[in-house]
Amino acid sequence: SSSLSLETKDKDKIVMTYCNLVNKLKTLKKEIYVVEVCEGDYFLREVAEKTNTKLIPIDTPIIAAGKILANARAFVSGRYHPAILASLGGTPCVFMASNSHKTKSLQELLKYENVVEYPVLPSDEEIMSIVQDTSIVIQGGDETRDKIRNRAKELCDNAQTISELIK
């Protein structure tokens, strides 16, 4: 991803960091999938292989990918558009930084109580915080999912009124 390339060119460091993140997330005893969103995420294939984790590849049809994300227990990512797809189904996200304000703004739009963006290459301590935050949002269950889903629907409904305003 462009955020990673700004952070480091060291592919081994990137793969090692994400392997560590995936392995720590596995301690939550939930099924983990690695989601390859764009060509810049190709390194995630190696992460999936090294951690023995299922991969949702870049060529997954958008409707299928959206359904997977919308029904996930949680989504850890710095990717804006997949986070929107996840949010439409109420999936809580734990956000990593991107090279723009978008993921922070999305959290604010969806009225997240704790607006946080973790670094794209998190330290061991930050990985533990990501895992803890992921555990918390999963424990929020249907209440958290309903809150996110309802807010996403409200925003969607509001967006439809824009066409009336600009006629």
Where are the regions a protein language model picked out?
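Active-site anion-handling motifs in enzyme catalytic cores
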Residues: S1-K167
